[in-house]
C-alpha cells in the first residue's frame, strides 16, 4: 500500500546559468565595499534628511517626486535600525556610528545589480539572440556611471530598475498573448506591468516618461486586436472572461471578445497604477504624522491634522466664526510665502518714491510670521460691541462684516486710491479719521468659496472665504510684491477690482480663533495673547490631504540657481560633463559620476544607425521592396519602439524643462540606448553582412569594440569606486576631455 513512498522522487530544475552568472556579477559590482566611503556623498545629503524625517515620523514636503522613492530609502534605514539622528548638513561629513551606511545604500545597489539580468531578459523577449542579450547585460554591468549611481543612497538606480521591469513585464505579457491569453502567466505579467509603471512614477516624476511609452505601445497593440477577426465583439463572452473558471477555456477559444482584452488592459495599466499611486501617499501620510519644518507650506486645515505644531495651537478652538470672534486670517495661496493678514501702527508714506501720493492711512500687509498684530475682530456693522454674544451668532455666507484690527481697533478699509506697488489695484488700509472729507469704507461681504450644500456658516480652518468690498466690489487680495523698507519688506495687500474667479491669492481661511469676551481694549489685548480653548474635532479626509499635498508638490518650485556641476541635455549625449561626487579629506581618492565614453558614443551611433536604416526600409517598403522577412521586420520595429522610443521619451523632455539639470538625469535614457546597441549590431550581422567572411570580420570588430569598453571601464575604476588615491599625473591622464572636472589637490 505504501510502496509508492519507496519510489525515487525526481525534481527537474531549469536553470539559466547565464542569468545566474549575470546576477552574481551584478551583485558583486554593486555591493563590493558598499560602505566605502563612510561619508556623505553628493545628494546623499539631500535624501538623508528625508530618511531622518521618516525615522522620526515628521512631516515633510519634497517637490522632486512622489514619496515612494523616499520610502524605499527609508526602508533601508529602518532595516538597519537607524534612529534618524544625524545632521545632514555637509557633503563629505563622516557618518557617525549610529548610521547604518550599508543598509541605507543596499536597496539602490540591489536595484542596480538586478538591472543587469533584466537587460539580458528584455533582449531575449524581443526575440534576439542570447549573444545579443549577453552583450546588453555586460554593457549594463561595466558602465561606470550606472555603477557609481547605484552604489550610493540615490534614486536613479531604483527608477531604472522599475523602468526595465515595466518593459520586461510588458514584453512577457505580449509574448503570452500570442499563445496563452488570459492564462495565469498572462494576468501576472500584465498586472506586474501596471505595478512597475506605478512604482516608476512613484520613485520620480521622470517615471511618467516610461509609463507613457508602455501605454503607447500597449495602445498600438490593442488597436491591432480590434482588427483580429478571430475575436468576437462584446457579447456573451463578457461574463465568462470575468470568471476564473473560464480563463483556462478562453485561452483556447477563438471567440474571446475584444471587450475582455481592452477591459483587462484598462484595469491593469490604468486603474492599478492610480490605486497604487494613491496608496503611496496614504502610507506616506500615515508614517509622517508629526508636525515638521515644512508645515507652513500647507494649509491651516492640513497643519491642524498633524500632531503638534498648529494642531497643538488650534486644538479646541471654536468651530463656527461668530460676530465678535477674534481670528487670524491666512492667505490660502501662500505665494511667495505663507502669510497672515497683518497691520501695525505705521502709515503709508504721504508720497511714494515714484511721486504718487497715498491716503496716509494705517498700513495693512501680509506677514509671514505669527504675531499678535495678525489678530482681527469680526464685527457686526449694526452693533457696537466687539464681543461674542450669548448664544453666539454665527457669520454666514453673504453677511456684511467689519474687520477690526485687534491691537489698534481700526477697521479694514479700501477706497479709490492706488496701491503702493500695484497702481492698477486699490490701496487697503486700516481707517484713520483725519477729520477730512474721506469717509470710512469698511464694509465687506463674506463669500464662502467652498461652502457645502447643507450649511453656509463660516468655519474655522475649514472654510475658504473671500472678502468683497461693498462700496467698490474690490476683493481683498495678496499681490505677492514685497513692500520697501517703510513697509518692513512685508507683502502687499490690495483691493482687486478686476478679479475673476476664485484665485487662491484672494481666498483666506481662519487659522486661529477664539470667542472674545471683553469690551475693554487692555483686557482684549490680554485675551489675544492667550486664546481660550473649546474642544472641536477637525479631521481632513485622505483625499483632501492627498489633493493638497500633490498640488503643493507640483506648484512648489525649488531654488533652481546655477550649480557648479549643472549641465545641459546637449552635453549628455557626448559625455562633455561629469560630476565630482566626493573627495577624500586627506588623499586624492575621489568619486565621479563619469560614464564609459565608448558605450555612450556607441549608443548615440546606434540610435543614428537605427533611424537611418528604418527610414531606408520604410522607403523601400513603400516601393513594395521588402528587404526583411515579416517576422524580422516586426522584431525590428518593436525593438525600436521600446529601445529608441525609451531613449527619446526619457531624454527629449529635458529640453523643455526650466530646472537645474545634472548628468544623472540622462541615465534612464542611457539604459535604453544600451538595450538598442546589441539589437543594431545583431541586425547588421544577420541582414547586412552578405557573406560568412563579412560576418567573421564584423564579429571580430565587435569583440575589439567591447574590449575597448572594458578597458575604459577598468581605467576609470578609481573614479567609479573612489578606493584608490591617484597621483596628480595619473589624474591629469584621466582628463580625456577639457570639460571634465577632475579634482587635483595643490600641495
From Swiss-Prot:
<dbReference type="GO" id="GO:0001669">
    <property type="term" value="C:acrosomal vesicle"/>
</dbReference>
<keyword id="KW-0677">Repeat</keyword>
<dbReference type="InterPro" id="IPR032421">
    <property type="entry name" value="PMT_4TMC"/>
</dbReference>
<feature type="transmembrane region" description="Helical">
    <location>
        <begin position="183"/>
        <end position="203"/>
    </location>
</feature>
<keyword id="KW-0472">Membrane</keyword>
<keyword id="KW-0479">Metal-binding</keyword>
<dbReference type="Pfam" id="PF16192">
    <property type="entry name" value="PMT_4TMC"/>
</dbReference>
<feature type="glycosylation site" description="N-linked (GlcNAc...) asparagine">
    <location>
        <position position="471"/>
    </location>
</feature>
<dbReference type="GO" id="GO:0030198">
    <property type="term" value="P:extracellular matrix organization"/>
</dbReference>
<comment type="similarity">
    <text>Belongs to the glycosyltransferase 39 family.</text>
</comment>
<comment type="function">
    <text>Transfers mannosyl residues to the hydroxyl group of serine or threonine residues. Coexpression of both POMT1 and POMT2 is necessary for enzyme activity, expression of either POMT1 or POMT2 alone is insufficient. Essentially dedicated to O-mannosylation of alpha-DAG1 and few other proteins but not of cadherins and protocaherins.</text>
</comment>
<feature type="glycosylation site" description="N-linked (GlcNAc...) asparagine">
    <location>
        <position position="435"/>
    </location>
</feature>
<feature type="glycosylation site" description="N-linked (GlcNAc...) asparagine">
    <location>
        <position position="539"/>
    </location>
</feature>
<keyword id="KW-0256">Endoplasmic reticulum</keyword>
<feature type="transmembrane region" description="Helical">
    <location>
        <begin position="597"/>
        <end position="617"/>
    </location>
</feature>
<feature type="transmembrane region" description="Helical">
    <location>
        <begin position="661"/>
        <end position="681"/>
    </location>
</feature>
<dbReference type="GO" id="GO:0046872">
    <property type="term" value="F:metal ion binding"/>
</dbReference>
<dbReference type="GO" id="GO:0006493">
    <property type="term" value="P:protein O-linked glycosylation"/>
</dbReference>
<keyword id="KW-0328">Glycosyltransferase</keyword>
<feature type="domain" description="MIR 1">
    <location>
        <begin position="318"/>
        <end position="381"/>
    </location>
</feature>
<dbReference type="GO" id="GO:0000030">
    <property type="term" value="F:mannosyltransferase activity"/>
</dbReference>
<dbReference type="InterPro" id="IPR016093">
    <property type="entry name" value="MIR_motif"/>
</dbReference>
<feature type="domain" description="MIR 3">
    <location>
        <begin position="453"/>
        <end position="513"/>
    </location>
</feature>
<keyword id="KW-0812">Transmembrane</keyword>
<keyword id="KW-1133">Transmembrane helix</keyword>
<feature type="transmembrane region" description="Helical">
    <location>
        <begin position="206"/>
        <end position="226"/>
    </location>
</feature>
<keyword id="KW-0325">Glycoprotein</keyword>
<feature type="transmembrane region" description="Helical">
    <location>
        <begin position="154"/>
        <end position="174"/>
    </location>
</feature>
<dbReference type="GO" id="GO:0031502">
    <property type="term" value="C:dolichyl-phosphate-mannose-protein mannosyltransferase complex"/>
</dbReference>
<keyword id="KW-0947">Limb-girdle muscular dystrophy</keyword>
<keyword id="KW-1215">Dystroglycanopathy</keyword>
<dbReference type="InterPro" id="IPR027005">
    <property type="entry name" value="GlyclTrfase_39-like"/>
</dbReference>
<dbReference type="GO" id="GO:0004169">
    <property type="term" value="F:dolichyl-phosphate-mannose-protein mannosyltransferase activity"/>
</dbReference>
<protein>
    <recommendedName>
        <fullName>Protein O-mannosyl-transferase 1</fullName>
        <ecNumber>2.4.1.109</ecNumber>
    </recommendedName>
</protein>
<comment type="pathway">
    <text>Protein modification; protein glycosylation.</text>
</comment>
<dbReference type="InterPro" id="IPR036300">
    <property type="entry name" value="MIR_dom_sf"/>
</dbReference>
<feature type="transmembrane region" description="Helical">
    <location>
        <begin position="122"/>
        <end position="142"/>
    </location>
</feature>
<dbReference type="Pfam" id="PF02815">
    <property type="entry name" value="MIR"/>
</dbReference>
<dbReference type="Pfam" id="PF02366">
    <property type="entry name" value="PMT"/>
</dbReference>
<dbReference type="InterPro" id="IPR003342">
    <property type="entry name" value="Glyco_trans_39/83"/>
</dbReference>
<dbReference type="GO" id="GO:0005789">
    <property type="term" value="C:endoplasmic reticulum membrane"/>
</dbReference>
<keyword id="KW-0808">Transferase</keyword>
Amino acid at each position: 500500500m505504501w510502496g509508492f513512498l519507496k519510489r525515487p522522487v525526481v525534481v527537474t530544475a531549469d536553470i539559466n546559468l547565464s542569468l545566474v552568472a549575470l546576477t552574481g556579477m551584478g551583485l558583486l559590482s554593486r555591493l563590493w565595499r558598499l560602505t566605502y566611503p563612510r561619508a556623505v556623498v553628493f545628494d546623499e545629503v539631500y535624501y538623508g534628511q528625508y530618511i531622518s524625517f521618516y525615522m522620526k515620523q515628521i512631516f515633510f514636503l519634497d517637490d522632486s517626486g512622489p514619496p515612494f522613492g523616499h520610502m524605499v530609502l527609508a526602508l533601508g534605514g529602518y532595516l538597519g535600525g537607524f534612529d534618524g539622528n544625524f545632521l545632514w548638513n555637509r557633503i563629505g561629513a563622516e557618518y557617525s556610528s549610529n548610521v547604518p551606511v550599508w543598509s541605507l545604500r543596499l536597496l539602490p545597489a540591489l536595484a542596480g545589480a538586478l538591472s543587469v539580468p533584466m537587460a539580458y531578459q528584455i533582449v531575449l523577449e524581443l526575440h534576439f539572440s542570447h549573444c545579443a542579450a549577453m552583450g546588453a547585460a555586460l554593457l549594463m554591468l561595466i558602465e561606470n556611471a550606472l555603477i557609481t549611481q547605484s552604489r550610493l543612497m540615490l534614486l536613479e538606480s531604483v527608477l531604472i530598475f522599475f523602468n526595465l521591469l515595466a518593459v520586461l513585464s510588458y514584453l512577457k505579457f505580449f509574448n503570452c498573448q500570442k499563445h496563452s491569453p488570459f492564462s495565469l502567466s498572462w494576468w501576472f505579467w500584465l498586472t506586474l506591468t501596471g505595478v512597475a509603471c506605478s512604482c516608476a512614477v512613484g520613485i520620480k516624476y521622470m517615471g511618467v516618461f516610461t509609463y507613457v511609452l508602455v501605454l503607447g505601445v500597449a495602445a498600438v497593440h490593442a488597436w491591432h486586436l480590434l482588427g483580429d477577426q478571430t475575436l468576437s465583439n462584446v457579447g456573451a463572452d463578457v461574463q465568462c472572461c470575468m470568471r476564473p473558471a473560464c480563463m483556462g477555456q478562453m485561452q483556447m477559444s477563438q471567440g474571446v471578445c475584444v471587450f475582455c482584452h481592452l477591459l483587462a488592459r484598462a484595469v491593469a495599466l490604468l486603474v492599478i497604477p492610480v490605486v497604487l499611486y494613491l496608496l503611496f501617499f496614504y502610507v506616506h501620510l500615515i508614517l509622517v504624522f508629526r508636525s515638521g519644518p515644512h508645515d507652513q507650506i500647507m494649509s491651516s486645515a492640513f497643519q491642524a491634522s498633524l500632531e503638534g505644531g498648529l494642531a497643538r495651537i488650534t486644538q479646541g478652538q471654536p468651530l463656527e466664526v461668530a460676530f465678535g470672534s477674534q481670528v487670524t486670517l491666512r492667505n490660502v495661496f501662500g505665494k511667495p510665502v505663507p502669510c497672515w493678514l497683518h497691520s501695525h501702527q505705521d502709515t503709508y508714506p504721504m508720497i511714494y518714491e515714484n511721486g504718487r501720493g497715498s491716503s496716509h492711512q494705517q498700513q495693512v500687509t501680509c506677514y509671514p510670521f505669527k504675531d499678535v498684530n495678525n489678530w482681527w475682530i469680526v464685527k457686526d456693522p449694526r452693533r457696537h460691541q466687539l464681543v461674542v454674544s450669548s448664544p453666539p451668532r454665527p457669520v454666514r455666507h453673504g453677511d456684511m462684516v467689519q474687520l477690526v484690527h485687534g491691537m489698534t481697533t481700526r477697521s479694514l478699509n479700501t477706497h479709490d486710491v492706488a496701491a503702493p506697488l500695484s497702481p492698477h489695484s486699490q490701496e487697503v488700509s486700516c481707517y484713520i479719521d483725519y477729520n477730512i472729507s474721506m469717509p470710512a469704507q469698511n464694509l465687506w461681504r463674506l463669500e464662502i468659496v467652498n461652502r457645502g450644500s447643507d450649511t453656509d456658516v463660516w468655519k474655522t480652518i475649514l472654510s475658504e472665504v473671500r472678502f468683497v468690498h461693498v462700496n467698490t466690489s474690490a476683493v481683498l487680495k495678496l499681490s505677492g510684491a514685497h513692500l520697501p523698507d517703510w513697509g518692513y519688506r512685508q507683502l502687499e495687500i490690495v483691493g482687486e477690482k478686476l478679479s475673476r474667479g476664485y484665485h487662491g491669492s484672494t481666498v483666506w481661511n481662519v487659522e486661529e480663533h477664539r470667542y472674545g469676551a471683553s469690551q475693554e481694549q487692555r483686557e482684549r489685548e490680554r485675551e489675544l495673547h492667550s486664546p481660550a480653548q473649546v474642544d472641536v474635532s477637525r479631521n481632513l479626509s485622505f483625499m483632501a490631504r492627498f489633493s493638497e499635498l500633490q498640488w503643493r508638490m507640483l506648484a512648489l518650485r525649488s531654488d533652481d540657481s546655477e550649480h557648479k556641476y549643472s549641465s545641459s541635455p546637449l552635453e549628455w549625449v557626448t559625455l562633455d560633463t561629469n560630476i565630482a561626487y566626493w573627495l577624500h579629506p586627506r588623499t586624492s581618492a575621489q568619486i565621479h559620476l563619469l560614464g564609459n565614453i565608448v558605450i555612450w558614443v556607441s549608443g548615440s551611433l546606434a540610435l543614428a544607425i537605427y533611424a537611418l536604416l528604418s527610414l531606408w526600409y520604410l522607403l523601400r517598403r513603400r516601393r513594395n521592396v521588402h528587404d526583411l522577412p515579416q517576422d524580422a521586420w516586426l522584431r525590428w520595429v518593436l525593438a525600436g519602439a521600446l529601445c529608441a522610443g525609451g531613449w527619446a521619451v526619457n531624454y527629449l523632455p529635458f529640453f523643455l524643462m526650466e530646472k537645474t539639470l545634472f548628468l544623472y538625469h540622462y541615465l534612464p535614457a542611457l539604459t535604453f540606448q544600451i538595450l538598442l546597441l546589441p539589437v543594431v549590431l545583431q541586425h547588421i550581422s544577420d541582414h547586412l553582412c552578405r557573406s560568412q567572411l563579412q560576418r567573421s570580420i564584423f564579429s571580430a570588430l565587435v569583440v575589439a569594440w567591447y574590449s575597448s569598453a572594458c578597458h575604459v571601464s577598468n581605467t576609470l575604476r578609481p573614479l567609479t569606486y573612489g578606493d584608490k588615491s591617484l597621483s596628480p599625473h595619473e589624474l591629469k591622464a584621466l582628463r580625456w576631455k577639457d570639460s571634465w572636472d577632475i579634482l587635483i589637490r595643490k600641495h
